[in-house]
From Swiss-Prot:
One of its GO terms (cellular component) is cytosol. This is Phosphoenolpyruvate carboxykinase (ATP). It is found in: Cytoplasm. Binds 1 Mn(2+) ion per subunit. It comes from Photorhabdus laumondii subsp. laumondii (strain DSM 15139 / CIP 105565 / TT01). It catalyses: oxaloacetate + ATP = phosphoenolpyruvate + ADP + CO2.
């Protein structure tokens, strides 16, 4: 079957004119030759590494630029979006006037006009009923490569019938000279228009803006249909039992969901509808700082031809120095999901989840390694999205820095966080799923909970052993803590026992509880949030 491609007239409909050439849904072979052309310079240029993957630099933007994110406020979005300038919660959904949007669109279309363009049509979402058909337009070969890796690649038959629901125009080379007069944050912009179904990118070359941009849009569209939209990894066992893992960076989400006994559904973004859990993506976007073949063989072995490395140091002989974080600690690789062997095939979807795991790395040494959550506690801890890391101070003292990120992904939420919590709990109740809070952080010994014990805890959750054991109630946080689990050091299960003096735990617990309560105050501007206060710590 022939693929129809895209005509200059269609591009003109978006405001892009006089295009020299359209390279439609290029093959990996063509992208490889395009992005490694010797004539390319700066951020456009790709370097071949000895692993077979191409490496690129994203310039000064080595991560997302949340302060430059905007959504057009109009009749469609006015009463649905969780706006940065309304309510108690702080978020990145800054409103944009239609007039400013029109100006930004003019900048991007002018940048893309008269050029040789790459157009990639792809799906966001593995379920045909709810997926977004997205058209990406860019003048940069490796950006086309990035979205080909990260999104779901349609068949020729699907491309022949492809009518996009959403357009992403990446004008990374253009900036906004009028930003100050328009009251914007900088000359760079990542702007969305839900009425026009379009994303505009200017000034930033970071590939993740396209990935997370579409995640933000799924986070708007799906919950309004009663479908859970989740920043999580997911896997499935031999008996078809599905588990989802929520957690912020550094909590062990990727490590713990990569399990030789279970097949990976996906590593980052999922939906949960009437049929079950499904991946939004067709690829993985893994951190590579300090990556080694011994510690993370799956990711290391996925870095081969067709993978795309970002901001890594490549030595003159083509060797990649994964330990070098001089450009950024956020070095990354994108690759198609089929670079991982132990995955769900042919479509990244499975049945309903029966286990929902919230991962936190508590550096305060307060939370138990595992606790069973009630439905109300599930919503409370989902909305809290807590983790903490140890940050060194000038005097060498390490003190915990707490992070609270709603739904373990506040940066990507487009609706009020309570809407995601309500949809998740409804899905869990319909499936009879249970939720657990797993602390991969520290305890009273001053040491981090061992990966051996954490894996034992995850096994006990997945095989049901945790439901068969007695529990005690941990005061202040009111959490149900198991008294014994197979393969797990019993002495660590009650965090109070890891302190020489239990009053030390109590003092730290009260401090952390106050932080939880203060953070949760921002959700009390809705009846749903106010009702959940009693599921939190008791002071």
């Amino acid at each position: 079957m022939s693929v129809k491609g895209i005509t200059p007239q269609e591009l003109a409909g978006y405001g892009i004119h006089d295009v020299n050439e359209i390279i439609y849904n290029p093959s990996y072979e063509l992208l490889f030759s395009e992005e490694t052309k010797p004539s390319l310079e700066g951020c456009e240029s790709g370097t071949l590494t000895n692993l077979g993957a191409v490496a690129v630099d994203t310039g000064i933007f080595t991560g997302r630029s949340p302060k430059d994110k905007y959504i057009v406020r109009d009749d469609v979005t006015r009463d649905t979006v969780w706006w940065a300038d309304q309510g108690k919660g702080k978020n990145d959904n800054k409103p944009l006037q239609q007039e400013t949007w029109t100006y930004l669109k003019g900048l991007v279309t002018k940048q893309l006009s008269g050029k040789r363009l790459f157009v990639v049509d792809a799906f966001c979402g593995a379920n045909a009923d709810t997926r977004l058909k997205v058209r990406f337009i860019t003048e940069v070969a490796w950006q086309a490569h990035f979205v080909k890796n990260m999104f779901i690649r349609p068949s020729d038959e699907e491309l022949a019938e492809f009518k996009p629901d959403f357009i992403v125009m990446n004008g990374a080379k253009c900036t906004n000279p009028q930003w100050q007069e328009q009251g914007l944050n900088s000359e760079n912009f990542v702007a969305f228009n839900l009425t026009e179904r379009m994303q505009l990118i200017g000034g930033t070359w970071y590939g993740g803006e396209m990935k997370k941009g579409m995640f933000s849009m799924m986070n708007y569209l799906l919950p309004l249909k009663g479908i859970a939209s989740m920043h999580c990894s997911a896997n499935v066992g031999e008996k078809g039992d599905v588990a989802v893992f929520f957690g912020l960076s550094g909590t062990g989400k990727t490590t713990l969901s990569t399990d030789p006994k279970r097949k990976l559904i996906g590593d980052d973004e999922h939906g949960w509808d009437d049929d079950g859990v499904f991946n939004f993506e067709g690829g993985c976007y893994a951190k590579t700082i300090n990556l080694s073949k011994e510690a993370e063989p799956d990711i290391y072995n996925a870095i081969k031809r067709d993978a795309l490395l970002e901001n890594v140091t490549v030595l003159t002989d083509g060797t990649v120095d994964f330990r070098d974080g001089s450009k950024t600690e956020n070095t990354r690789v994108s690759y198609p999901i089929n670079h991982i062997e132990n995955i769900v095939k042919p479509v990244s979807k499975a049945g309903h989840a029966t286990k929902v795991i919230f991962l936190t790395a508590d550096a305060f040494g307060v939370l138990p390694p595992v606790s069973r959550l009630t439905p109300e506690q599930t919503q409370y801890h989902f909305l809290s999205g807590f983790t903490a890391k140890l940050a060194g101070t000038e005097r060498g003292v390490t003190e915990p820095t707490p992070t609270f990120s709603a739904c373990f992904g506040a940066a990507f939420l487009t609706l009020h966080p309570t809407q995601y919590a309500e949809v998740l709990v409804k899905r869990m109740q319909a499936a009879g799923a249970k939720a657990y809070l797993v602390n991969t952080g520290w305890n009273g010994t001053g040491k981090r909970i061992s990966i051996k014990d954490t894996r034992g805890i995850i096994d006990a959750i997945l095989n049901g052993d945790i439901e068969e054991t007695d529990t005690i109630t941990l005061p202040i946080f009111d959490l149900a803590v198991p008294t014994a689990l197979p393969g797990v050091d019993t002495d660590i299960l009650d965090p109070r026992k890891t302190y020489a003096d239990k009053s030390q735990w109590e003092e730290k617990a009260k401090d952390l509880a106050h932080r939880f309560v203060d953070n949760f105050d921002k959700y009390t501007d809705t009846p749903a949030g106010e009702a959940l206060v009693k599921a939190g710590p008791k002071l």
